[in-house]
Design a protein with these regions (language model features):
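Vicinal oxygen chelate
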Residues: 15, 70-108
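Charge-dense, helix-prone N-terminal extensions
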Residues: 24-29, 48, 62, 78, ...
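Domain-length accessory/inserted modules outside core catalytic folds
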Residues: 40-48, 52-65, 72-74
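Core segments of cupin and vicinal oxygen chelate
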Residues: 2, 9-52, 85
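Short acidic/glycine-enriched loop/turn segments that link adjacent beta-strands
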Residues: 35-38, 64, 96-100
Length: 121
């Protein structure tokens, strides 16, 4: 049987800061019962069609770039500006002709990419 993605987990120094950023970015509420030690988005929805997001408190700051990142799609014209307004930072932009995307960091430095459409190769 093949694996499927259940959750996206992020280690955080400030759980609320990161969870609130992703809540606004994804347009979903932080789950009831979330705390300073652990928060989630979509975790309470047992019939979800997308992975839930989990935010785990850790005592130490990240010291290296994360080796896995999330690629997100937003067809809206202002996708990058909206995320910057929420607290993200642009790292670099890429355009290979048939596909373009922006590499960004959330307020605590978790790297992610955003594009207007899914890259199909």
């Amino acid at each position: 049987m093949a694996l499927s993605v259940a959750n996206v987990g992020l280690d955080c120094e400030d759980v609320w800061r990161v969870a609130n950023f992703w809540s606004a970015a994804l347009g979903q509420s932080v789950d009831e019962g979330s705390s300073e030690a652990f928060a989630s988005i979509g975790g309470a929805n047992v019939q979800r069609t997308q992975p839930a997001w989990f935010f785990h408190k850790v005592p130490e700051p990240a010291t290296t770039k994360n080796r896995v990142h999330v690629d997100l799609i937003d067809p809206g014209e202002n996708r990058v500006a909206r995320l910057v307004d929420l607290g993200a930072r642009v790292i670099e932009e890429h355009d290979i002709g048939v596909h373009s995307w922006t590499v960004m960091e959330d307020p605590e430095g978790h790297v992610f990419c955003v594009a207007a459409k899914v890259y199909t190769g």
